[in-house]
């Protein structure tokens, strides 16, 4: 096991480099004088192509969200600021995956490795922290429904944004500032050049934030069910209608949290138990679903939002469909 390759987010895994060595190529191509002495062909790891494709899709989706929020003055409420933060973080994460692919095959150096891994760590950290901030905002908007739209809430939102981006940037700077395994391979994690300790801190931090999000969503479910019951009593809804509305709201919350866990939990747990000696295919197989979370985020948090849908329609066709303008919010719209 000690000779298995490790994933290098800023360079080719060793198995791919070995596959492109001259002796391997000469076995497949007949020796013809100068051809046999030419440089080996560039061998591209299919996993890296998939990660780059995922990064491209992430950039396209989240760029649309960032442009909508930036272009629409009406989308300046705390909720939209946090959604914009999430979209910007995911946009940078997708850009980091693309840059990683370009640098890994065209411009390899220690500096590019550190800058690329720093960008990826900072952007994905900001993405996860933004998800936590959105969860906190949703909880506060329900728990303090009467005083939520106040100047105090806006100030609190800006404080959260400064803290989450400041923390994420600091985490991204750690490899650049010297906390990396470029000089000591034995300290490498499953993702080079991150150290094992660095990866462990990131994984434990994720588990802590996931536990906090789980607790907040449980409280949100309780509030949603209570609100749905009160609305049903006020409007004399049937018990079946109350049940359907509540179930829809709880199902939405379960889908949000379940998607987040399914995308990030495999890579988080694998980073805790594995090290650089493990086969790289396991790292790729757990890292790829984590990138899918940045693909799904715009669908869950942005494109499902009624106000963002209206802004998108105004930008694209200059009008708002009647189905959007007449739609009323329900307790399931969380």
Swiss-Prot record:
One BP annotation, GO: G protein-coupled receptor signaling pathway
Presence of the UniProt keyword Coiled coil in the record: no
Alphabetized InterPro entries for the sequence: GPCR_Rhodpsn, GPCR_Rhodpsn_7TM, GPR12, GPR_3/6/12_orphan
Topological domain ranges for the Cytoplasmic compartment: 70-78, 135-158, 221-252, 304-334
Subcellular location(s) of the protein: Cell membrane
Lipidation (S-palmitoyl cysteine): 317
Gene3D superfamilies: Rhodopsin 7-helix transmembrane proteins
Pfam family, one: 7tm_1
Carbohydrate attachment residues: 8, 24
Record has Transmembrane helix as a keyword: yes
Main location group: membrane
Gene Ontology terms for molecular function: G protein-coupled receptor activity; phosphatidylcholine binding
Alphabetical list of PANTHER family matching this protein: G-PROTEIN COUPLED RECEPTOR
General function of this protein: Receptor with constitutive G(s) signaling activity that stimulates cyclic AMP production. Promotes neurite outgrowth and blocks myelin inhibition in neurons.
Family recorded in the similarity comment: Belongs to the G-protein coupled receptor 1 family.
Protein name: G-protein coupled receptor 12
Natural source organism: Mus musculus
Classification lineage: Eukaryota, Metazoa, Chordata, Craniata, Vertebrata
Gene giving rise to this polypeptide: Gpr12
